[in-house]
Amino acid sequence: MTEARKILVTSALPYANGSIHLGHMLEYVQTDMWVRYQKLRGNQAIYVCADDAHGSAIMLRAEKEGITPEQLIDGVRAEHMADFADFGVDFDNYHSTHSQENRELSASIYLALRDKGHIATRAVTQYFDPEKGMFLADRFIKGSCPKCGAEDQYGDNCEKCGATYTPTELKNPRSAISGAVPVLKESQHFFFKLPDFEAMLKQWTRSGALQEAVANKIAEWLDGGLQEWDISRDAPYFGFEIPGEPGKYFYVWLDAPIGYMASFKNLCSKRPELDFDAFWGKDSTAELYHFIGKDIVNFHALFWPAMLEGAGYRKPTAVNVHGYLTVNGQKMSKSRGTFIKARTYLDHLNPEYLRYYYASKLGRGVDDLDLNLEDFVQKVNSDLVGKVVNIASRCAGFIHKGNDGLLVAANPEPELWDAFQAAAPSIAEAYEARDFSRAMREIMALADRANAWIADKAPWALNKVEGKQAEVQEICALGINLFRQLVIMLKPVLPKLAADAEAFLNVKPQTWADLSLPLANHQLNPFNPLLTRIEPAKIEAMVEASKEDLAAEASKPQGNGELAKDPLAAEINFDAFAAVDLRIALIEKCEFVEGADKLLRLSLDIGDEKRNVFSGIKSAYPDPSKLEGRLTLYVANLAPRKMKFGISEGMVLAAGPGGEEIYLLSPDSGAKPGQRVK
């Protein structure tokens, strides 16, 4: 007998900042199917995961909701676990990266890397939000694209033209958190010296640990030269403080993959028979597999194996990469109702339908998978209801009515039984290779053969013929045994259907080894419908509910609440707006106005003319000389106003509620005095 394999399997850790959607579920379902197959074969397969619970995004969301980060991640984790459980994703352990195990492992791995000379420190200059008192990650900086000029773009790439750039290249940068203009500030950062592991990575990435397409992409990065990886962030930050470095925290992507180890270590504390080092030690003979999406390949195929190597741990056996999910041929869309949360799906449909559809489309490659909702309905109704379950529903009634539910010992078609037996190794091979679509095709081909044979024998017709009842029982006995084989083969994909079928068949939980053992002279339990057809109306209701989710989110207070404080004015037509002559003005001189509590006097250059303006911005600019030399926006055709202190010839533009919160508006660099604002 072959010795059972020791296998540890992980999926990427979902971020503890939002709900699970069907795109996420693609990964967890396929991982779960592979683990269930391994367990069905008698292997020791252990599936661990955790919530990725650190980072600025979590800290800021908790602050916005008026709760602690710990309260936020605890609530999200409970939601995630409920969604996974209801989808049949059966983790052996589901933990959190905000755990004592992860804190200890992250510290020990960092210290091992540092002590071996793989950590560097140097000063970096990055944007700092003076209002929030925090350094800004690229995604928390917005401005105009330096290439195409598109506004409201992130600090690292333009969603309009696709350009990539550094935050310092962004035009008119602002903090996406507070709206403040960020300032450049220097800070000491810690770097993992990834180039130290270039030779090892070149060998490991070509060892069969990656799919060929992924290995080819990694080779491009390796050929381009590896860079040191910034593994630190400055306070305030929700995460683990770097040992011996007050105010410095591990970047979330350092402790996130260590979360795989931490979750397994947590499981070891619950199951004493498990040995942490037997799975993670340098000389471990266990197998280690990571299932991930193609968007995080660089972390898992470069940084992670290098960290493990440097800290004295084993490397993954393989990193299995999959593509993205599209719906109806397009990116998931909230407005179209195709950005479907796992819970919204569960409110309308059986999760096993989607598990089967994903399996029918998942191959070994990294291509995207399309959830075509019309095809989904057709495939589930045709394959699961019309083929697999149909065999049992055709045969069970005759056995219960004609023989009190007793399955006779008979095999009236040995060739068909043998064909099922002969197909099992190929189906097993497809499961092992994660070629789930091939496995489903081969299983459905067997279901077609079984249905065709039963249709040819027509037990419903024979049952009406005197003296043919025994033959009917033999036909239906083989039909039920073929159904049982199909259920065992589908058990990794459809665990709930398998459990319900096992209850009907009156058998213990089946394993792959049970495929070769037919039931004979065996009492069945009453048959109840195992699956029902999908009604298109349920799909429509799910899509509409997903749109409602969007509407509900849209109704929540968004942004900074400024519009609620000061609602938008009544709509005007274009001619009314065009009548306002906005110009660029240079502030040549700015000074206090004697006897005025709120006013500053601004002497403006608008190109060919000079203008004098009084503006109520004194409270925000206690040193008016600092405004001199600045460009601002000026209403040039506003009728002059006679004031106590002189005549004001127009108005400069500023934003803010008043007091110290007044912000004089400025144009982009390159604008010239006198130019019209359009």
UniProtKB/Swiss-Prot annotation:
Q: For the motif 'KMSKS' region, what are the positions?
A: 331-335
MF annotations from Gene Ontology: ATP binding; metal ion binding; methionine-tRNA ligase activity; tRNA binding
**How does the cofactor bind to this protein, according to its record?**
Binds 1 zinc ion per subunit.
Reaction(s) this enzyme catalyzes, per UniProt: tRNA(Met) + L-methionine + ATP = L-methionyl-tRNA(Met) + AMP + diphosphate
Residues holding ATP: 334
> Which CDD domains does the UniProt entry name for this protein?
Anticodon_Ia_Met (cd07957), MetRS_core (cd00814), tRNA_bind_EcMetRS_like (cd02800)
Which Pfam families does this entry report, sorted A to Z? Anticodon_3, tRNA-synt_1g, tRNA_bind
Query: Where does this one sit in the cell?
Result: Cytoplasm
Task: State the SUPFAM superfamilies in the record.
Answer: Anticodon-binding domain of a subclass of class I aminoacyl-tRNA synthetases (SSF47323), Methionyl-tRNA synthetase (MetRS), Zn-domain (SSF57770), Nucleic acid-binding proteins (SSF50249), Nucleotidylyl transferase (SSF52374)
A cellular component term from Gene Ontology for this protein is: cytosol
Q: What residues does the tRNA-binding domain cover?
A: 576-678
Assigned keywords, A-Z: Aminoacyl-tRNA synthetase, ATP-binding, Cytoplasm, Ligase, Metal-binding, Nucleotide-binding, Protein biosynthesis, RNA-binding, tRNA-binding, Zinc
Q: What is its EC number?
A: 6.1.1.10
What Gene3D superfamilies does the entry give?
A: HUPs, Isoleucyl-tRNA Synthetase, Domain 1, Methionyl-tRNA synthetase, Zn-domain, Nucleic acid-binding proteins
Q: Residue ranges for motif 'HIGH' region?
A: 14-24
- Binding positions for Zn(2+) per the UniProt entry: 145, 148, 158, 161
Report the domain of life of the source organism.
Bacteria
* Chief location: cytoplasm
User: One of this protein's GO BP terms?
Assistant: methionyl-tRNA aminoacylation
Q: Which InterPro entries match?
A: aa-tRNA-synth_I_CS, Anticodon_Met, Met-tRNA-synth_bsu_C, Met-tRNA_ligase_1, Met-tRNA_synth, Methionyl/Leucyl_tRNA_Synth, MetRS_core, MetRS_Zn
Q: Which cofactor does it need?
A: Zn(2+)
Give the residues annotated as coiled coil. none
Record's family? Belongs to the class-I aminoacyl-tRNA synthetase family. MetG type 1 subfamily.
Q: What does this protein do?
A: Is required not only for elongation of protein synthesis but also for the initiation of all mRNA translation through initiator tRNA(fMet) aminoacylation.
Q: How does it assemble?
A: Homodimer.
The name under which this protein is listed is Methionine--tRNA ligase
Q: What is the protein's species of origin?
A: Ectopseudomonas mendocina (strain ymp) (Pseudomonas mendocina)
What gene is behind this protein? metG
